[in-house]
Amino acid sequence: MEAFLGTWKMEKSEGFDKIMERLGVDFVTRKMGNLVKPNLIVTDLGGGKYKMRSESTFKTTECSFKLGEKFKEVTPDSREVASLITVENGVMKHEQDDKTKVTYIERVVEGNELKATVKVDEVVCVRTYSKVA
């Protein structure tokens, strides 16, 4: 989990509009979502707890979690989901289930780059971040 800690600035996003569309996000929210480049901040809270915060001019969301334990999360598009985060072989796996669709996010750190691959059904998005702190 150590490799994921810090502040990450989004540099590139490919296919995010299709992910939002598949999740049923309305047109206006999709357009706003495509314009912003959020920072991702991952913090160790101690005692096996972590916080993941996504900050942008459009919206800020955060969740606190323990690896391997389910928790409730509100997504940036305001869906309430049951989430689970694990780390296996250097890959952070994040599952979000809103009871109609399941979103799978895999995050991998290579040097100062974090790559998040987002999948909903057969639709795939790749978001790339660079480490800033």
Curated annotation (Swiss-Prot):
Give the molecular function GO annotations.
Answer: lipid binding
Entry-linked Pfam families: Lipocalin (PF00061)
Positions of post-translational N-acetylmethionine modification: M1
Q: Where does hexadecanoate bind?
A: R107, R127, T128, Y129
UniProt keyword annotations, A-Z? Acetylation, Lipid-binding, Transport
Q: Which PANTHER family match?
A: FATTY ACID BINDING PROTEIN
Job description of the protein: Has been implicated in the acquisition, storage, and transport of lipids, and may be important to the organism since it is incapable of synthesizing most of its lipids de novo.
Q: Which family does it belong to?
A: Belongs to the calycin superfamily. Fatty-acid binding protein (FABP) family.
How are the domains described in the entry? Forms a beta-barrel structure that accommodates hydrophobic ligands in its interior.
Q: Give the protein name, as stated in the record.
A: Fatty acid-binding protein homolog 1
Protein species of origin: Echinococcus granulosus
The gene behind this protein is FABP1
